[in-house]
């Protein structure tokens, strides 16, 4: 059998044996100081003291001779004695410390010792084998070592055992912490604070989880990730990270510039289809976008004793003179937050106030929440009977399909359009203008209306939005309202060419904060040229990212609709989006 083994960097079972044998060999080798009659420390102290004392005496005498112009070769009896004492002490010290060094060069270990070491290393390499037991790592430590079977010759490489990377064995200190977590003495969420090492905390938490559940996490990577970067910002109590492949669609020609669009997805055909749409747009002269609106929203809900008092606050907020004062209060929360509007609606004695503001290059939910809190504190001076029920009353509306977002917009409202040449429709998209226009009307418009869709008048906008969001560090949950889209297709130029557009009223994106600061997501933003905050024009990077999302959606809509019109959808998905793996193997 083809045995593949890795040298362990940890102390294995064979290392103590080797250490004992080497120690035994060293004990048999005679030392130069073994036969000294006096204790070593006594003789060493005497000769060290003699050596430095004589050196000091001679230097002092020679300095006096130089001052008095006495020849140096004229020596007194005391100086002659000092020279002999210096030579004697130097010979002793050289002999004592030099013989051990010479012995280490001359008296090498015998070949028998090295042969024994090689034999131990060979046994150690056999013991280091892949741990394929279906038990947690901690339980595996308590299990006896398996019997080593004799090697078996196999004729096929497919019969070789699969090599699985194992997690390094925990130290005694880590073992105590793991047991403390399992016993409930140490909260799992406090490991980062107590240890001061985020990677070590994740490793200990992971091992404790495996022992607690009895399930292996061998397929979930642990190493290769900066856990310090997510502390207190992106994720709590991490035990690893999930790998999602990132593909590139493009170049997307948008507003005269080319963009390579990163898409993180596990759906086959998605990147390829979007890439085909980008090609069709590029060959037709590119696409063009318009930013219609920019403003994130937050809508707190407050309650009064009567509906009349709720209406009084509504009228107060809608008064232009009062709005200027509220704007000053709101804008104090951040140098980027700028209040735009406050729209109110009443439900009985409850009032919902929908604040809308710009937030620079950040998506802005935290920023607007601070500004809203400032305004609520200010309003309670004039309306002390106002009871703040919640800073979010779902009139925002965040991460939920809502008509208010579809009509009023939330985040960035963008429309993107392109005119596709008839020749490109036929040669690249493999269909014709008439078929696309008819399919779009019956599917995206009539079909969605029959389904009672809210913002879903499109083929698959959420596919592209989700893929770009994950790749660039956006909030994937905000794909709900960010994917609101209506796709329009009309014949132009006497029916020869196709005008296609997507209108997306609530794209919620940012280029700073949240997941955008992670290394992988930051690299994807850098690829698009929108990494971080724009120092020249605040918010321009986030607005550009929103237009890129809309442009990618336009390409994806164009390609999928063409595949449907040409009857290619099933064939392409069977070719690129079908798994051939055996899914019947049980998971431990």
Swiss-Prot record:
Pathway: Metabolic intermediate biosynthesis; (R)-mevalonate biosynthesis; (R)-mevalonate from acetyl-CoA: step 3/3. The active site is at 267 (charge relay system), 399 (charge relay system), 475 (charge relay system), 573 (proton donor). InterPro entries: HMG_CoA_Rdtase, HMG_CoA_Rdtase_cat_sf, HMG_CoA_Rdtase_CS, HMG_CoA_Rdtase_eu_arc, HMG_CoA_Rdtase_N, HMG_CoA_Rdtase_NAD(P)-bd_sf, HMG_CoA_Rdtase_sub-bd_dom_sf. One of its GO terms (biological process) is coenzyme A metabolic process. The chain crosses the membrane at residues 38-58, 82-102, 544-564. Its EC number is 1.1.1.34. Residues 1-32 are annotated as: Disordered. GO terms for cellular component: chloroplast membrane; endoplasmic reticulum membrane; peroxisomal membrane. Its main location: endoplasmic reticulum. Belongs to the HMG-CoA reductase family. Catalyzes the synthesis of mevalonate, the specific precursor of all isoprenoid compounds present in plants. Component of the triterpene saponins (e.g. ginsenosides or panaxosides) and phytosterols biosynthetic pathways. Promotes triterpenes accumulation in roots. This is 3-hydroxy-3-methylglutaryl coenzyme A reductase. It comes from Cannabis sativa (Hemp). The gene is HMGR2.
